[in-house]
């Protein structure tokens, strides 16, 4: 099964995937969207793809927020009250919790896109998490966002590159050892021939992602490790006496600038 067949199969068999796409399609050009995402590599890559998706599909601007805590709270959402009412709140890569329904008291439409094991299922929020009801493990939220873009017909090379990075960041596959989560394999087989240079294996210093073979690494592993360090950049401020922006925002803005060039490193 190739990647496009996997996306089509998921659309046929997973009603949550279909509902997520219908939610995006239901937005208008003047819609306001707020996205809370995890602050790790997978979360920042997901935030970028969601921002990119909404801009490309409907010309919709998205406010992206990546709080330091994993679980989203009602207070986090309330802090954006001054921004007015949002038409859609997307919670990406921040877990699936039953009490996320509390957020619906202040946000009329909530879509959760996540790949973690659910800690109870919300009844009001819309949830796209292939792990719900003990279904297949989805490997990375970035991949789920890329699948939505693919079904909408708006994914391109920069999205492929960012998705590969997000998948590597959450250990969906290992370029050096060849190990790969089954759910991510169709994407890996699709993206490898499209961007072969990032899958090059080199005999250089191993990265944090080289857990199987410490004698070599891959270009994608090196890039992802740099991005991981970028998400932590704000923690270096005291050591270097610098005013460094919040790491996840720094990385997201870099991705946006990268997408505007139409090229990747």
Q: Each PLM stretch: what is its role?
A:
Residues 101, 108, 213-265:
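Acidic/histidine-rich
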């Amino acid at each position: 099964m190739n990647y496009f067949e996997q996306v089509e199969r998921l659309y046929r068999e997973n009603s949550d995937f279909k509902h997520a796409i219908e939610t995006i399609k239901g937005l208008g050009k003047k819609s306001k969207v707020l996205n809370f995402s995890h602050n790790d590599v997978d979360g920042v890559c997901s935030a970028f793809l969601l921002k990119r998706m909404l801009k490309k599909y409907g010309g919709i601007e998205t406010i992206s927020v990546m709080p330091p805590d994993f679980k989203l709270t009602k207070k986090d959402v309330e802090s954006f009250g001054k921004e007015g009412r949002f038409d859609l709140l997307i919670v990406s890569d921040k877990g699936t919790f039953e009490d996320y329904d509390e957020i619906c008291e202040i946000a009329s439409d909530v879509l959760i896109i996540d790949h973690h094991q659910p800690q109870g299922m919300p009844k009001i929020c819309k949830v796209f998490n292939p792990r719900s009801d003990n279904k297949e493990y989805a490997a990375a939220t970035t991949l789920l966002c890329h699948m939505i873009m693919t079904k909408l017909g708006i994914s391109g090379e920069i999205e492929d590159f960012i998705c590969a990075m997000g998948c590597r960041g959450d250990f969906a596959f290992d370029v050096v050892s060849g190990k790969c989560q089954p759910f991510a394999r169709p994407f890996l087989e699709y993206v490898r021939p499209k961007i072969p240079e990032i899958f090059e294996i080199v005999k250089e210093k191993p990265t944090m992602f080289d857990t199987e073979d410490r004698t070599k690494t891959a270009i994608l592993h090196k890039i992802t490790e740099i991005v991981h360090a970028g998400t932590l950049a704000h923690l270096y401020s005291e050591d270097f006496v610098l005013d460094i922006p919040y790491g996840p925002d720094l990385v997201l803005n870099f991705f946006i600038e990268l997408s505007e060039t139409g090229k990747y490193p």
